[in-house]
Amino acid sequence: EGESEVSNQWLGNINSIRGYNEVMTSPDIYSLFNNYKYLLICQTDVWIFRDDLMKWIDMGIDLVGAPGPNRNMYLHFPMKQYLQLKVKLKPANKNLHCQMFGRIGNGGFCLRKVELFKNLCIKYEQEIQLYNSLEDPLHNEDIFWALVPTELKLPTIEQAANFAFDRKLELCYKINNYTLPMAAHGYDRKHRKQFWSRFIPKEAFKKQ
């Protein structure tokens, strides 16, 4: 309850995305919520269609966010093998977009288990330092949580699509049986407006 202030080094214009990545991979931020089981992260470019929050809390999962669904062509030969080889041959400190195919947890609108994430920030301290030293979008904090820890209890891609959409909107819509999720992240981005304008009032979109 109430408000808590955090350092400008974390949030604001000083360090921008880098500061945000640092805050969301620090045990200190999760310690602010020690009295709570879950932390719901809701960024300012989120549109919420309904409140299903208790349903997700009752599932007992560790993390849920918009999924990165895998197109059917990447699930079969030869594209499946091609992507596997591409990942195997990449430089150690480089992430590829295809590594997020079939992963859970876009950070714009997500639910995280507080105590577990606080402990994981400590357990993976060295890996986190490496990620935060590499300033490219494929090393953002939500990419870290999607790719590095292996012990997270996650929903299926189909379940996560009922929580939120972020990318591959038509595919997410199909996976979710042509129904809307609880929320949309990044709904007002120019290249997503065509999809979301069917469901969100035009007044909600920034003038572009």
What kind of region is each of these model predictions?
Residues 20-22, 76-82, 109, 193, ...:
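Pol beta-like nucleotidyltransferase catalytic core
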Residues 25-28, 55, 63, 116, ...:
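Alpha-helical elements of Rossmann-like donor-binding domains used by nucleotide-donor carbohydrate transfer enzymes
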Residues 36-49:
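Short beta-strand-to-loop acidic/aromatic patch adjacent to the donor-nucleotide binding site
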Residues 46-90:
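Conserved donor-nucleotide/metal-binding helix-loop-beta segment in metal-dependent transferases, i.e.
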Residues 91-208:
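Catalytic core and acceptor-binding pocket of nucleotide-sugar-dependent glycosyltransferases
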